[in-house]
Design a protein with these regions (language model features):
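Acidic, low-complexity cytosolic segments
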Residues: 2-7, 11-129
């Protein structure tokens, strides 16, 4: 199965970007995380469940919330949503397996802990140009 995820952001439910891998260097992770966090909260308020995906032109954003973290990725809208969601859930499970302290809530909020996470998920990510 080929790589389908372009960019990925992992946010704490309070809006802090703990990890991001973005191909375009002009996109500031903390700025985007604020937008995604607000959008997700808005969706939760309206639908009592949050937003699972949305599209902008030819890009689909897929969102999954687990254990106080929001996982967001984007991909071509030509890729089946179920395939993207399965890949995102696989990454989320890997995140919690590698960093179990964040689940136990004894994490000290140091985002440097996650700086090498890209190496663990590289097989899911489209190569950067």
């Amino acid at each position: 199965m080929g790589k389908v995820l372009r960019d990925i952001w992992i946010l704490h439910e309070h809006g802090i970007a703990v990890f991001s891998r973005v191909i375009d260097p002009n996109i500031a992770p903390q700025l985007v995380s604020g937008l995604f966090s607000a959008l997700y909260k808005f969706g939760e308020t309206l639908s009592h469940g949050g937003i699972s995906n949305f599209e902008l032109n030819s890009i689909r954003f897929t969102i999954e919330k687990m254990n106080h973290f929001i996982f967001i990725t984007n991909s071509s809208n030509n890729v089946k949503p179920k395939r993207v969601m399965n890949e995102l859930k696989k990454i989320a499970k890997k995140f919690f397996n590698i960093y179990p302290e964040v689940v136990r809530e004894n994490w000290n909020n140091d985002i440097n802990l996650f700086k090498n996470f890209e190496e663990k998920i590289i097989d899911s990510l489209v190569d950067s140009v």
